[in-house]
């Protein structure tokens, strides 16, 4: 029985979305146990499950605008910190939160702790492609700076994830660069390229450009945290802007446009669901001793349930354990 | 009378699109003269204008897959190199090409030459926002690496451009970063932030995130060439993927969806035209002694004409001359 510690107080719709997501997941999976950290009375308002679930009460919580490292240090009894400590103490196998991302990164780093020989855990998400398979990208912003060796470790971690959690055999690894030729990029990219090309255990397919990401050009895309963050936010911002404009065009387009939209409803819905990658779960801070997963602050119960499913798969396939074994071989850098 | 040198042989639809764009521009503007470089017989097939236009014949051209610097050095009689040389010799005031971007950057850098005290010219484009005003971003990839001082110069250049060419008073300058707080980012961002904040001649509004770019959060956005290239390609790739998926959903959605799309036609067209920023012209390699402008390889006559309009505005407002004056004050770095 795998145990997942849930920060029930983080996110825009806490605790309702978290607790209802927990209800769903407990129905769907008989082999998990959930521990909910937060305000017991409020949690009980929404909790319908009665087996394999427990509540650890606390009044304290971390807010979305708290300074991350300070919050972790000062709010020792917050729902997020208690959830992370449960993993540290061996009382839970993984943490899920929809709260303050920076604080969760800090909690993961300082409380759960890094895998030996991994200097800089990276933030990994599965992002959508037009054909639906998706791709895993990291680092999406856990770090503001990375070395070539970090990126090399991300290629390994991303490959483990794509293979274990998404079932992709010999995942194709691409290095995000400003052109596809092997000579492209700044010194960081050139050095990373050499490291990736030299390791035959990786299925390295060379440089990939941001324009091709949604076309499924690679299964795993590695980049530094600064660029990854900018690319992720560009994709999100563009998708939101276009969908918003489409809606505006329809609403401002008179009766004809509205009738057209009504007839197109199913097609538009299908488009939206293809672009919506919340089914793939949340963002994993990968490189820690246990899964620490952030789901969107705006997550609803369904997304929370998907994220619990993702964590369950990570635990069942022991992707973290495999990483520990692999990186223990590395000489300390 | 301003003279614009046009590489008539570069781009997917050369020379037709270039020559037809020239025809249109000559009709629209009575105060410009165009010099077309390329295959005279082919150019004449499409040339309808007879005044203020001349052809300089050459058989040589640079291909899209030529190695840029080598091509510039070896193909001395190519249409692109001859156009750049005409500017260098004072026979033309600006260059336009739809050909090999890298080669045009090299031609700009080595033939047209940099403005004194500008180390690294940057690639600037006007990109779309949902409200239609757009924003200017640089560097979009002329450089793989930049220093804080380069980014500071881009803020000045971008401000000149937005004010002169787009008529925006005291343009708001944002620094692309991985968060809006002033303490965010890697050392490059932190150092750039200090430089921008210390210069009261700039209307610096602080850090901006990639997610907000299309919402018009700033008029000028500065970043290093690697990140700018990744962000530009992410925006383009996402927009193309979504529009492609929308089309696919409609085509695969049966009669109902097709009828809906027919009724929505005007709204979808309006959406497309809002996202299409070819009206704003091409990408300017800014920081050179004359306007060197790249229009998309796939540009049609209308886009070529828009780019000629853009160059005409740059020449009439003397945005390059203003930059020369401004940067001549700087101590050599």
UniProtKB/Swiss-Prot annotation, chains A, B:
Function: Catalyzes the reversible formation of acyl-phosphate (acyl-PO(4)) from acyl-[acyl-carrier-protein] (acyl-ACP). This enzyme utilizes acyl-ACP as fatty acyl donor, but not acyl-CoA.
Biological process terms in GO annotation: fatty acid biosynthetic process; phospholipid biosynthetic process
Compartment annotation: Cytoplasm
Species the sequence originates in: Streptococcus gordonii (strain Challis / ATCC 35105 / BCRC 15272 / CH1 / DL1 / V288)
Protein name, as recorded: Phosphate acyltransferase
GO molecular function: phosphate:acyl-[acyl carrier protein] acyltransferase activity
Keyword line: Cytoplasm, Lipid biosynthesis, Lipid metabolism, Phospholipid biosynthesis, Phospholipid metabolism, Transferase
Enzyme class: transferase
Coiled-coil parts of chain: none
């Amino acid at each position: 029985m795998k145990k997942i510690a849930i920060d029930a107080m983080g996110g825009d719709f806490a605790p309702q979305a978290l607790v209802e997501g927990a209800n769903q997941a407990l129905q769907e999976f008989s082999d998990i146990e959930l521990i909910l950290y937060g305000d017991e009375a409020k949690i009980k308002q929404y909790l319908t499950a009665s087996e394999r679930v427990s509540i650890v009460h606390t009044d304290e919580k971390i807010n979305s605008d708290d300074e991350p490292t300070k919050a972790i240090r000062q709010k020792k009894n917050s729902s997020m910190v208690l959830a992370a400590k449960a993993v540290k103490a061996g009382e839970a196998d993984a943490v899920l939160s929809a709260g303050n991302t920076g604080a969760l990164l800090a909690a993961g780093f300082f409380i759960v702790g890094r895998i030996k020989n991994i200097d800089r855990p990276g933030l990994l998400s599965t992002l959508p492609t037009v054909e639906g398979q998706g791709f895993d990208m990291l680092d999406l912003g856990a770090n503001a700076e990375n070395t070539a060796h970090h990126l090399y470790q991300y290629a390994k971690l991303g490959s483990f994830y794509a293979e274990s959690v998404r079932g992709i055999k010999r995942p194709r690894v691409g290095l995000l660069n400003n052109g596809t030729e092997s000579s492209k990029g700044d010194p960081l990219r050139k050095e990373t390229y050499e490291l990736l090309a030299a390791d035959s255990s990786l299925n390295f397919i060379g440089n990939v450009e941001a324009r091709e990401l949604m076309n499924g050009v690679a299964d795993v895309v590695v980049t530094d945290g600064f660029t990854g963050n900018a690319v992720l936010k560009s994709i999100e911002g563009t998708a939101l802007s276009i969908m918003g404009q489409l809606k505006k065009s329809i609403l401002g387009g008179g009766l004809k446009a509205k009738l057209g939209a009504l007839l197109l409803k199913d097609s538009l819905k299908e488009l939206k669901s293809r672009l919506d990658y919340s089914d793939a779960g949340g963002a994993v801070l990968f490189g820690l001793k246990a899964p620490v997963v952030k789901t969107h602050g705006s997550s609803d119960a369904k997304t929370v349930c998907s994220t619990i499913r993702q964590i369950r798969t990570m635990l069942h396939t022991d992707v973290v354990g495999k990483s520990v074994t692999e990186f223990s071989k590395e000489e300390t850098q």
